[in-house]
Amino acid sequence: MTDNLKLLPINEKDYEFLYKLLSERKQITFISHKKMPTYEEHVKFIESEPYSKWYIIQIDAKKIGSIYLTKENEIGIHFFTQYEESERFQNVIKEFFLKEPQDRFFMNVSPKNEQYIDLAKKLGFHLVQHTYERDESKIF
């Protein structure tokens, strides 16, 4: 485990960082957003406490991403692009498992995000379902 890796609970001072992180996400990794929310919408979302746990990922005192746990034990993880690497991803997930021990975790990964799919498998996750979405604008 990396000694300089920290998972810090989010607070109000992190809102701007989280918005910047969201704005830099690759479109292929979006599962929960069709379009970028406004900053005000983003703050409302954070303040609605949508997750049971939400942490800033920090290495060497630099914020590089976030990781959260939904109320259904689903893990979400996002890094700034320059910090996406498999060893770092694995270290963050392992640290998260130590911080939030549970019997069972889920991870939603876009089927287009092959890097995260491979990493999830390396960490012992296995495919349990395919989820499909119907876009209301495409009715028959």
Q: What are these model-predicted stretches?
A:
Residues 70-82, 108:
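Conserved acetyl-CoA binding element of GNAT-fold acetyltransferases
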Residues 4-20:
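A short beta-loop-alpha structural element at the N-terminal edge
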Residues 44-56:
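A short helix-loop-beta-strand connector motif used in the catalytic cores of GNAT acetyltransferases and
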